[in-house]
């Protein structure tokens, strides 16, 4: 007969005492990721957070498979199968949507597990600036401050006000949302037009094109 491997309270306490430093460091690591892992705060920590979130799905699937192999009882086996199938379908669905988005915008932000949209600004100097965005807004307002372009609070690139295009884009797996510049404000209180600039882009149209084809003429808003 197989031995019962359940830990008693004394063994659990001893195990915690032995690994408490590791547990403390691991919890601190997760706390820093969750609290400071935003694209507007630290791009490095944010990317690390995305990697950790991505690893959770394979980990869930692996634990689910183990639960199916070693179920506590019949009810536990049924629950383990349902949860494992759900985890597998969710992970496959994530990859399908991410690959569709990558095909549309050619940005690694397509694999961001926190979002299903990527913003793209094709500067007139040839640079392409991509940024993570949680949803598809009606208005975007990128700014240039001291020669640096920001959008949605994220540092994108060094550029001049004249480098901003007439249209910018927010891509989703099935749509390309096109934003047209409707207003432009340049200059600060000192009159320096290169130091600060604000641009207002309003949602103009929606189509199913990719960023390689930027023709927007004749597109209606919900085609």
From Swiss-Prot:
Transmembrane spans: 19-39, 50-70, 76-96
Membrane topology: Multi-pass membrane protein
Domain of life: Viruses
A single MF term (Gene Ontology): structural constituent of virion
Subcellular location, record wording: Virion membrane; Host Golgi apparatus membrane
Topology feature Intravirion, residues: 40-49, 97-223
Cellular component annotations (GO), alphabetically ordered: host cell Golgi membrane; membrane; viral envelope; virion membrane
InterPro entries the UniProt entry points to: GAMMA_CORONA_M, M_CoV
Virion surface-side segments: 1-18, 71-75
Annotated Pfam families: CoV_M
Keywords: Glycoprotein, Host Golgi apparatus, Host membrane, Membrane, Transmembrane, Transmembrane helix, Viral envelope protein, Viral matrix protein, Virion
Function: Component of the viral envelope that plays a central role in virus morphogenesis and assembly via its interactions with other viral proteins.
Subunit field text: Homomultimer. Interacts with envelope E protein in the budding compartment of the host cell, which is located between endoplasmic reticulum and the Golgi complex. Forms a complex with HE and S proteins. Interacts with nucleocapsid N protein. This interaction probably participates in RNA packaging into the virus.
Family to which this protein belongs: Belongs to the gammacoronaviruses M protein family.
Protein name: Membrane protein
Gene expressing this chain: M
